[in-house]
Regions:
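Short active-site loop at a secondary-structure junction
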Residues: 49-57, 79-136, 175-184, 256-259, ...
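C-terminal motif of bacterial Sec signal peptides marking the signal peptidase cleavage site
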Residues: 16-19
């Protein structure tokens, strides 16, 4: 009797485990948005095919939850490794969003004063004809010149943000601070250097302490091309014939605050959720994050802390950011009132392209 009972238990266990299907950890898929997600997949795959992008990941958040996240294509063409939603990719200019959060948190804590000068924190920085206050840097209104092509992709090893200041610190300002918007990576890199000096901590440590650990963004770190990083996808570029090739070696550490962060679509979507809902960001903090500044002629800035501020054709507020760097690119789109966040990242050099996320947003918005 005991033997028969034991056999029945074993059979029951085998039936239970035999009937279990392996969970697909490469995707999050909320069936209540099935139609919208299928249209999203179609649009994103079409975008990748048109632009010969080997791989990417995409994520969508609605009302505080990730409703869709997936890796599509290849993380490595050479090794035929599929892209997953966890793979890390270069996000280019979108890195500024993380830098601005650290900056505003340091202001909130009283460690940085927006009205203090750059020279107050970096005494060796040359004096300028006009007061160069910190508050101009995250708005790209400092008058610091735009980087040249060769400065965007310095050859060799460039491990220091502080060393990267030498490219521009002795140049004259192109206009009085606060007059015009001119996007330059030098603004964000200088802001990162100031934060390092004020806190006596390196930028990767600040990113971890003020953003990724608190918000549990497990796949967002500063890139370091000279060491292995688990989950980092391979990077690709295109030659003169439009053929996809391996991207050349590029050490982005000197521009970590502006272009040098690795992340993925899901972490970007989680960042959007946190900005909209997390207690870590007070209402006052969020207002400052998206607050335009005044420009010459009583105009308002179109950017704030790395975010493009705009409205769509239906009059809805939209906050967006896109980025491109050697071997990668990304974009994030937020509709605050609709609690909608859309993000993607790819492993091919692309121009700053917001088109895919705007097209996808239409599937989730009621006109």
């Amino acid at each position: 009797m005991i033997k028969s009972f034991s056999v029945l238990i074993i059979v029951a266990i085998l039936l239970v485990f035999g009937g279990c299907k392996k969970k697909n950890t490469n995707s999050i898929y909320d069936n209540s948005y099935k139609d919208e997600i299928e249209l999203t997949r179609k649009d994103f795959m079409s975008y990748m095919a048109r632009n010969h992008i080997p791989g990417g990941n995409i994520a969508i958040a609605k009302e505080g939850n990730i409703i869709y996240s997936e890796g599509i294509g290849l993380a490595s063409k050479d090794l035929d490794v599929p892209m997953t939603r966890h793979n890390l990719l270069r996000i280019g200019d979108v890195s500024q969003l993380f830098t601005s959060i650290i900056y505003l948190k340091l202001v909130e804590e009283g460690i940085l004063d927006p009205d203090s000068t750059v020279q107050h924190y970096i005494p060796e920085y040359p004096e300028t004809d006009f007061k160069l206050a910190l508050k101009y840097l995250p708005y790209h209104t400092s008058g610091i010149r735009k980087q040249g092509p060769s400065e965007s992709e310095l050859p060799g090893l460039n491990p220091s943000i502080q060393k990267g200041l030498e490219s521009f610190m002795n140049d004259d300002l192109t206009s009085p601070p606060g007059w015009y918007e001119e996007v330059s990576m030098f603004n964000t890199n200088l802001l990162g250097a100031v934060m390092e000096r004020a806190t006596k901590k390196k930028f990767p440590v600040l990113l971890k302490e003020y953003v990724t650990d608190t918000l549990q963004l497990a796949n967002t770190i500063v890139d370091n091309s000279v060491v292995p990083i688990e989950g980092r996808a391979d990077f690709y570029d295109q030659n003169m014939l439009g053929q996809v090739i391996n991207a050349p070696f590029h050490d982005t550490r000197y521009k970590a605050p502006s272009f040098g962060i690795l992340s993925n679509a899901e972490d970007l979507a989680k960042l959007g959720i946190a900005i909209l809902e997390s207690d870590y960001f007070s209402e006052e903090f969020t207002e400052k994050l998206f607050e335009p500044c005044n420009l010459y002629g009583n105009y308002k800035s179109k950017m704030a802390n790395g975010w493009i501020l705009t409205i769509d054709e239906q009059g809805r507020d939209v906050n967006a950011s896109s980025g491109s760097v050697m071997g990668g690119g990304a974009a994030i789109l937020m509709y605050p009132e609709e609690e909608l966040v859309i993000a993607y990242a790819v492993n091919l050099t692309i121009g700053n392209n917001m088109l895919p996320v705007f097209e996808i947003a239409n599937h989730f918005l009621q006109d």
